[in-house]
């Protein structure tokens, strides 16, 4: 299914055909550009495929570039009655990959997108060519920052998330048209609900709903160690800190390591040239 982007700003900044994948009653937005070896881009929260616009434009010349919006984010549907647990996001990714018949995939994953992407990868290692992780949560021993701990308080969390832009302070310095493309999809009640469910689904104790899924993923990461891999880390990210970086180094001791000194939560906006250069060389070196 093909549609036109609803934001006027996107015609200039995001000149890609919007496509939609049906999953049950809902639509998942994605872009599918170029041809060649497959790159699958997975965004962090509360970002969306817009964060990868420069990479899509650059790599579509020699690759087939797929980038999808997670349920509840970007231009995907934002149903109030959807179960936003990790397992369901992973199921959507699996369905999309099957539907598009994607094979020998190189994943480029950021934040929550890394968690979902790795959930797929450990279950389908034969379909993974290589992977690059940008700042992401450790699968165990992850401590929520205080601002998100407060959002887990039952009587208070919804009021905070519905009333405050928790994740967008870093974009205030961006050009107005870029800022609008990030902020507009986050303003609705339905979008705020998806942000809250994301926060609530981050496991902090073994009893949390997605804790078992996270541990199962972590225990299976060894299967991917022979794959070409890289870890790219923004040093100023307040959510996924150096402690997470050290865990990812333990997961993949042979991975190429890169640190971006001046980049923060919105890594692709803070260091676009550096990020593109690292990825270009990685893809060339491993012929991905």
Set out the residue ranges of the language-model regions.
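Helix-rich cap/lid subdomain of alpha/beta-hydrolase
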Residues: 142-197
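Conserved serine/cysteine hydrolase catalytic core
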Residues: 191-250, 259
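Catalytic active-site module of serine/aspartate enzymes centered on a nucleophile-bearing elbow/loop
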Residues: 255-288
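Active-site loop/oxyanion-hole signature of alpha/beta-hydrolase fold enzymes
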Residues: 21-24, 31, 67-109, 277
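Conserved hydrolase catalytic core segment
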Residues: 103-142
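Conserved HGGG/HGGXW glycine-rich cap/lid loop of the alpha/beta-hydrolase fold
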Residues: 31-75
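Alpha/beta-hydrolase fold catalytic core
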Residues: 1-39, 60-63, 98, 102-103, ...
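The conserved beta1-alpha1 loop
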Residues: 42-44, 110, 233
